[in-house]
């Protein structure tokens, strides 16, 4: 599938490949396969079902980084993985310049503030559709979102308005119109 995706993208956009697996060894295999087909970056989440500590998450991600040596977007989604990529994790990962971004999907505004203030070297990416405006206000430069798959024009308009034009008054109006869709996307049971 990675090869097919790479052909379809044909260099028009960066290709980011997820490496999620229970075992670090399997994540490394996926990451190396991604590198071999020409992926531009990796998406690394916490291993599912394992409930790792911050140290264990960092060791997992650093092992993948050592083998693949590609830019990495971390994926923090404690609502699904039941653990947070905490400060211990982020501090340990700061040892490698490959950890360039984090898709933050905790839903916790305090965590957004902490990431923006304390980890400016890790680019913020919004992972919660209904919090895009807040993320953009705090400096996020990207948004990895489900809704863009079926409402791309509205998502592009919000990004253009907030990130490129810094017009948060207009951005609030766009986001307000999008909120009914966002509520559906962020509700439980998906």
Model-inferred region functions:
Residues 1-82, 92:
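Active-site beta->alpha loop and helix N-cap motifs at the rims of alpha/beta catalytic domains
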Residues 66-67, 78-188:
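Catalytic alpha/beta core domains of metabolic enzymes, predominantly
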């Amino acid at each position: 599938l990675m090869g097919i995706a790479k052909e379809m993208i044909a260099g028009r956009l960066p290709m980011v490949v997820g490496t999620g697996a229970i075992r670090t060894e399997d994540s490394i295999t996926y990451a190396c396969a991604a590198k071999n087909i020409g992926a531009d970056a990796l998406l690394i989440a916490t291993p599912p079902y394992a409930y790792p500590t911050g140290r264990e998450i960092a060791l997992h991600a650093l092992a993948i980084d050592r083998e693949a040596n590609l830019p990495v977007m971390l994926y923090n989604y404690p609502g699904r993985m039941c653990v947070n990529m905490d400060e211990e994790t982020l501090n340990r990962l700061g040892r490698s310049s490959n950890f360039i971004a984090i898709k933050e999907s905790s839903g916790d505004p305090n965590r957004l503030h902490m990431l923006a203030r304390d980890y400016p070297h890790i680019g913020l990416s919004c992972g919660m559709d209904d919090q895009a405006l807040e993320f953009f206000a705090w400096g996020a430069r990207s948004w990895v979102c489900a809704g863009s798959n079926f409402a791309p024009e509205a998502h592009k308009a919000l990004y253009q308005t907030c990130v490129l034009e810094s017009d948060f008054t207009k951005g609030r109006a766009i986001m307000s119109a999008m909120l009914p869709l966002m509520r559906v996307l962020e509700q439980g049971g998906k």
